[in-house]
Amino acid sequence: MVLRYKLPPGYPQPLTDIIGELVALSPAVVVRAPDGRVVQVSADQVVALKTLGARPVASREIRALELAAADAWPGTEQTWIDGWLLRYGDGFTRRANAAAPLGRAHRIGDLYSGETLERLRAWYAERGRALTLLLPDRLGTAPEGWTTGGETLVMAADIGNLTLPDGTSIVEVTDRPGPDWLASYHYRGALLPEPALAVLSAVRDGRVAFGAVRGGAETLAITRAAITDAPDDRRWVGLAAVEVAQAHRRRGLGFLICGEMIRWGRDRGATHTYVQVEEDNAGAIALYRALGFVDHHRYRYATAPTP
């Protein structure tokens, strides 16, 4: 937001502006500047209050966040081939079993020459998987004839701009998911396959934790959080596997557990937070917007045509 307001007598100019986050509209207009300053202006001194368009996200920022997210969900095996990061997770989740063009642009092999493509295919074939590409905005496009799908929205926030819970937390946080946590997580509506535990527990050069809200012997809500560093020196905490028990939905538990796990990350040095959510999951997107997340970029998957 940009706030223009009147200055008291004695200033050389009658008006001034401040750009920042709108904190409150009543009883006074309150704006928090990027440097943390909070400006409070009575309504009768406000000249204009205008929403600014979102700052465009640079390609380097997309690459940096994708690298941090890949370390937070690395699968069980990773390698680099011609500037492509390949992950393998024994088939559990698409993003843990896909190749992404996350190297520097001049180091990424030319898929359309066929040489790099064949190397990627061979690596996955050795592990019994077909090649799937994960293609973030502006970092890569699908080869001609390939099928794309699974459009995913990456949402992010500066933790300093969020209002997080304070006081004693009711969320139980552990380093590994226990049996109750695993029983509460239904990946794509089904019970977890055998490889899931290794993928859920994996993190590269970071820290992972599993949060749960309990009511007596019942697990009411769960989520996974992982802290990793991006090449631009931002420390991210990423949320995944957010689930609330069917009988306890629409009671604010999703909002609560996400806020608590972001706080867990902040207390361990995280400055930013992100989530990855399929674009047709309207309920989850609404939850994250309510928490303060904004759109960062999108990615999609590409698969080769069937011979």
Question: Model segments located where?
Answer:
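N-terminal charged segments
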Residues: 10-13, 23, 41-125, 140
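Acyl-donor-binding surface of acyltransferase catalytic domains
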Residues: 85, 112-191, 302-303
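A short, internal acetyl-CoA/4′-phosphopantetheine-binding micro-motif in the GNAT/acyltransferase core
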Residues: 100-110, 242-249, 278
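Conserved acetyl-CoA-binding loop-helix of GNAT-fold acetyltransferases
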Residues: 112-121, 240-246, 250-267, 272, ...
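Conserved GNAT acetyl-CoA-binding A-motif
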Residues: 127-136, 265-276
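Conserved beta-strand-loop-alpha-helix junction that forms the acyl-donor binding cleft
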Residues: 134-139, 246, 275-285, 301-307
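Conserved active-site tyrosine of GNAT-family acetyltransferases
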Residues: 143, 288, 293
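Flexible, substrate/cofactor-facing loop regions flanked by secondary structure
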Residues: 165-240
